[in-house]
């Protein structure tokens, strides 16, 4: 039974990656694609709308506080499972020491807003409607977590949350 569950989890992970990596998901051009991201010490700069339509730029946080980018989608079970742990970072010992930005991948504002409300997400969620930021960061599977230090360097990039994120801060 354990093997079966592991096989299903591995298959879901691969399918999430395949969905994001397909040719229809790639973009040509855009601000985010022109600046360094994955494979670089510098994060790709971007500006994306939040659920209220306000434009949020990564640059407004750099140099002030570390930023955790959470690449996710409403249909991703692993993303849903991580919400309580991410929410805990907004009220626990890390509160005020870490800016968390959820980045939803290619879904409508309405769908994302419903998920944010029903799942009790307590951190800002931005809409990557064209997938340009995911492309700039070479996201091939979700969830993907990118931790950017106060100095603007990428410190962590994985599909799981770091066990002790405070050691990176």
Predicted regions and their residues:
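Hydrophobic beta-strand core positions in alpha/beta domains
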Residues: 70, 102, 146-147
């Amino acid at each position: 039974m354990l093997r079966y569950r592991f096989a299903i989890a591995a298959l879901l992970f691969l399918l999430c990656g395949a969905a994001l990596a397909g040719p229809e998901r790639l973009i040509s051009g855009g601000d985010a694609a022109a600046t360094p991201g994955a494979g670089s010490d510098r994060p790709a700069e971007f500006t994306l709308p939040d659920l209220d339509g306000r434009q949020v730029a990564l640059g407004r946080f750099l140099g002030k506080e570390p930023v955790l980018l959470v690449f996710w989608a409403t249909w991703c079970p692993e993303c849903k499972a991580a919400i309580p742990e991410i929410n805990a970072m907004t009220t626990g010992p890390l509160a005020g020491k870490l800016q968390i930005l959820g980045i939803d991948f290619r879904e409508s504002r309405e769908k994302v807003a419903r998920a944010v409300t029903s799942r009790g997400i307590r951190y800002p969620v931005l809409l990557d409607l064209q997938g340009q930021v995911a492309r700039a960061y070479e996201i091939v599977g979700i969830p993907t977590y990118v931790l950017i230090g106060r100095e603007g360097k990428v410190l962590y990039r994985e599909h799981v949350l770091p066990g002790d994120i405070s050691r990176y801060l």
